[in-house]
UniProtKB/Swiss-Prot annotation:
GO terms for cellular component: small ribosomal subunit. Gene3D superfamilies: Nucleic acid-binding proteins (2.40.50.140). SUPFAM superfamilies: Nucleic acid-binding proteins (SSF50249). Keywords: Ribonucleoprotein, Ribosomal protein, RNA-binding, rRNA-binding, tRNA-binding. Residues 1-26 are annotated as: Disordered. This is Small ribosomal subunit protein uS12. GO terms for biological process: translation. HAMAP family: Ribosomal_uS12_B (MF_00403_B).
Amino acid sequence: MPTINQLVTKGRKRKASKTKSPALNQSYNSLHKKYKKLSAPFKRGVCTRVATMTPKKPNSALRKYARVKLSNGMEVTAYIPGEGHNLQEHSVVLIKGASVKDLPGVRYSIIRGTQDAAGVNKRNQARSRYGAKKAKK
């Protein structure tokens, strides 16, 4: 435990908060070849690999994910939500920071219904999350 004198001379250091989605917090300037700290809600990228992985212990499934090379040069793993998808290698996608609890290392989620990622077919509830159009009557 520090003495009062130590606290007066040095003081307490503020603990820096760690971001949950670091790839969204920097942009790349290709002209000057430098990274710039710039927070963004979404980032565009190109799929380099589309595959499945199994979740952590109590759950059992084959979760779809894509390895995405972002516009700032970073490569991240992003989850593909919803049932069925049309993504393949070289598909252009938009990602957001949304961690998947039972997939370790997956901190991002692909936004359905934008760029090359088509919306989920025959979806009636929570349609805006999955880029689904309203069903015709």
